[in-house]
Amino acid sequence: MSTPNSYDDEELEELLRRKAAQEQKRIEEERKRKAELESQKESILRVILTPEARQRLTNIKLVKPEFAESLENQLIALAQSGRIKIPITDEELKQILEQISQQNRRDFKIQIRERGWK
């Protein structure tokens, strides 16, 4: 005897199938949205970077993907706000990378104290 609040196996399986289908659809929509955003970003980068600078950025992306993502976003923001000359050449990109490198550089001081072992 089933109670009004309980589900039988078929209803439960149908609920699970619907939930799984909804989740799959959500994941697919998220993937499409990310692909569209990436396509838009690549399109903007093609406009604001020379081919040589784009190649350098691609090489950076292979080695440091998170850094490259951050750099792409910064370059797009600078270009859209008009704070940088377009197109950005490879030399200008090198200068930007050098500035970022100097900002992130940390000086470490290592002190070695001698201990008398007895």
Swiss-Prot record:
Q: Name one GO cellular component term.
A: cytosol
Q: Which GO MF terms are attached to this record?
A: DNA binding
In terms of domain of life, where is this protein from? Archaea
Q: List the disulfide bonds.
A: none
A Pfam family of the record is dsDNA_bind
Q: Which UniProt keywords apply?
A: DNA-binding
Q: Which InterPro entries match?
A: DNA_bind_arc, PDCD5-like, PDCD5-like_sf
**PANTHER family attached to this UniProt entry:** PROGRAMMED CELL DEATH PROTEIN 5
Matching entries from HAMAP family are given as: dsDNA_bind (MF_00026)
What does the similarity note say?
A: Belongs to the PDCD5 family.
Please report the name of this protein according to its UniProt entry.
DNA-binding protein SSO0352
Q: Which organism is it from?
A: Saccharolobus solfataricus (strain ATCC 35092 / DSM 1617 / JCM 11322 / P2)
